[in-house]
Regions:
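ATP-binding N-lobe of GHMP and related small-molecule kinases
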Residues: 2-150
């Protein structure tokens, strides 16, 4: 894992340009993507301080045939597009902290993943559900802090 300072330098210096071209295709947006990643890392540092982190990209998608896997019994044809959400993520013991864009921070204790009526239909409940599902299926979960932007 690299530090946020090292990660930012990789993007600002152009060392990650080949990766950015591979993900986003459009050469004309290279400067924009470099700055976008640097800004996301800076925001992560403002929220959580400097330290080791990783970067993840979740591509957007477009449905070509079918829509919503839950309505189609998993039978849809989708394609990824070169728009995405990126997350800057660092490890944290026992707690999950997530900030998405300008939304307030969500904080979840890994010791409290039970369903709560007052949390239903919230982003917090979705995150808790994924974590609980991983744990219930034998997966190992750990705490993290993340800043996400799209």
């Amino acid at each position: 894992m690299k530090t946020t300072k090292e990660l930012k330098e990789l993007f600002v210096s152009g060392e990650k340009d080949e990766l950015l071209r591979d993900i986003y295709i459009d050469e004309a947006l290279l400067d924009y993507q470099r700055q976008r990643y640097a800004d996301a890392i800076s925001r992560y540092e403002e929220l959580y301080g400097c330290g080791e982190a990783e970067i993840y990209s979740a591509p957007g998608r477009s449905e070509i045939g079918g829509n919503h896997t839950d309505h189609q019994n998993g039978e849809v044809l989708a394609a990824s597009i070169n728009l995405d959400a990126i997350g800057i993520v660092g490890k944290l013991d026992g707690v999950v902290k997530v900030v998405s864009g300008t939304a307030p921070q969500i904080e979840i204790s890994l010791d409290d993943l039970d369903v709560k009526e007052e949390e239903k239909e919230t982003t917090k409940s979705l995150i808790k559900g994924v974590l609980a599902g991983i744990r219930e299926h034998g997966g190992q979960i750990g705490g993290f802090q993340a800043y996400i932007t799209s």
